[in-house]
Amino acid sequence: MSEFNFISRLHNRGLISHITNEDNLSKLIENKSISLYCGFDPTEESLHIGHLLPLIMLKRFQIAGHRPIILIGGATSLIGDPSFKEKERVFNSNYNVNIWTEKITKQISCFLDFNCGKNSAVLLNNNTWFKQINILSFLRDVGKYFSVNTMINRAAVKQRITRPDQGISFTEFSYNLLQAYDFFILNQQYQVDLQIGGADQWGNISSGMHLIHRKTKRVVYGLTVPLLIQSNGIKFGKTESGTVWLDSNKTSPYKFYQFWMNIEDANVYYFLKLFTFIKVSEINKLEKNKNINNQIINDKSLLAKHITQLVHGKEKLLAAERITKFLFLKNTTHIEESDLQQLKQDGIPFIEVSNVKDLQEALVLTSLAQSRTQAKNMIISNSISINTEKIRKNHIFHEKDKLFGKFTLLSRGKKQHSLLCW
């Protein structure tokens, strides 16, 4: 197999966890444009960064000339995928699923090109076909092709069945068949030859391939991207403050940008290969020079920049960079009023004030100091800044301290901040 073909390039970036019939799939996609799909169940009002790799994989295939199909699980989300879940999901209402579907559809739309000719992206909802099938038809036309013994022994289900405190309901157990039917319908109606997903979807993808082969004798393919786990064993994208969402109203572009700036050093160059479109040869050069002048910090910034722009766009990336420079590089030149409003929304402690006179009082009010005495000592020890400027003696506030006439940023060291809102 040529080292320059598409599948080899995906391997070179570490993007493939599982793949079926690799040689045949590689020949297929080198010789013609194929249709592939990935499903997303709207079980929340936003996707999170755990969904990024499959989305970016679809984008890579589209750039290579193939047609990506996004399948929104309007029906399957009413059941919930039990794969590797420790306990049964809480059912979502039709009302919530419909609202979440609209929101997630808008999020996904910015990743792919829906107007580029023959390989334009397609957006579908599996509720379209599931609302037309009855239970007896489904059991006769789909269920008869599956062995319960095989289904029980799939790793995604087995861990639930073997736990004494948790079983699995027939409802969740049937999810595997529903997703298999999705693949079958897409193969029949949209000529889909490949399903992609996260590594935890391998069992569901395999079931779809099995169903298609049993019913039609056709050969189709599956490919999964790796599941990313942090060194503490927690899934990538989970932080102490919660999930990192793609929706800017749930995780601001600034917080999103900072998440990537704070990843473990060991992951920087791997993630550049996974999440960006920078050439592997260029990434390897960056890694070779990572210890020169602390270059790895710049490389983290490069990663954060590429992914933030991909998810949130250029304008919100620039705002995230302005806030970062303001807080960490003491650069107030280009800060905008909306950036400070964003800081307030992002959870930086703030208090509404009107008649605070001096810095010591403000430090106590914001809990950056426990007493005026402690505040005085912190000021003397050069630990306190006003709008990123170090203060060495008690300070009486003036209008010039109020950015845009409204905000004063107090900082204790590099990481503790509080915003005075006048």
From Swiss-Prot:
GO biological process, one term: tyrosyl-tRNA aminoacylation
Superkingdom as given in the UniProt entry: Bacteria
Binding site for L-tyrosine: 37, 175, 179
Keywords in alphabetical order: Aminoacyl-tRNA synthetase, ATP-binding, Cytoplasm, Ligase, Nucleotide-binding, Protein biosynthesis, RNA-binding
Class of this enzyme: ligase
Record motif 'KMSKS' region, residues: 235-239
Enzyme Commission code: 6.1.1.1
GO MF term (any one): tyrosine-tRNA ligase activity
Short name of any one Pfam family annotated for the protein: tRNA-synt_1b
Intervals of motif 'HIGH' region: 42-51
Segments forming domain S4 RNA-binding: 357-414
Binding residue positions for ATP: 238
UniProt keyword annotation of Protein biosynthesis present: yes
Localization per Swiss-Prot or TrEMBL: Cytoplasm
Quaternary organization: Homodimer.
Protein family membership: Belongs to the class-I aminoacyl-tRNA synthetase family. TyrS type 1 subfamily.
Protein name (database record): Tyrosine--tRNA ligase
Organism expressing this protein natively: Buchnera aphidicola subsp. Acyrthosiphon pisum (strain Tuc7)
Gene that encodes it: tyrS
